[in-house]
Amino acid sequence: MSVQRNILASLVCFIALNGFAQTADELVAKNLQAKGGVDKIKAIKSVRMTGNFDAGGFKAIVGELSKRPDMVKETFSLQGMTQVQAYDGSSGWQISPFGGRKDPEMLGEDDVRGLSEDADIDGPLVDAQAKGNKIEYLGHDQVDGDDAYKLKVTLKNGDIFYYYLDPDTYIEIQIEKQQLIRGSVRESVTMLGSYKPVNGVMYPFSIESGPKNNPDQRGKITVTKMEANVPVEDSEFKMPAAPSAPPAAKATPK
């Protein structure tokens, strides 16, 4: 009897995962609806997040400010210093005091690419076709021993994301990313949980990310505050001018 029950349970799981929502479009529609619906998602014009970062006892305060269209500013604060990376919709810049560079400087192409993806406030599943993103349904896979729907999302720039959706809620619980950087493939993974509504849209309040094949190098962000539609000027994302050098002292005539 126990064998029959196990077979029946497996069959029910198989039917649940394969008998419904088998197309990419259907899964995306269910995902967006589960997160609040496209109208509510698009009604959010800006988002401010603050959280605690922990990587094996190494702790810091992180923040992210996003605004339509395609602007983002990310901060990492530790021991009285704050690293800043930002994208204003066309170019990216940073202030990196931990590397001894306290003046703003332009970012390289690879860093800008990642920031520009973060700046998509809706994510790659919303208006995917208009953005040039290709979405494929790859069946189901395992996340920590549990079944999940798997979507492959190929961005217009060639970066690839694998979205793993909870079969009950249709919300993403894990995202894997593949990037080709200087001729080599870089893979990372992000695990998402503790979803809460903000202005009617579900956001993860637990975010653990790092190299896909090296769990020891992953860090976890626990969101402490999330605000939507906060007033913010576009100038917040523009690279500030470097401070002017003090005038050279004039030599005193003898």
Regions found by a protein language model. Name each.
Residues 64-71, 88-91, 110-111, 166-169, ...:
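A short, sequence-level motif marking secondary-structure junctions
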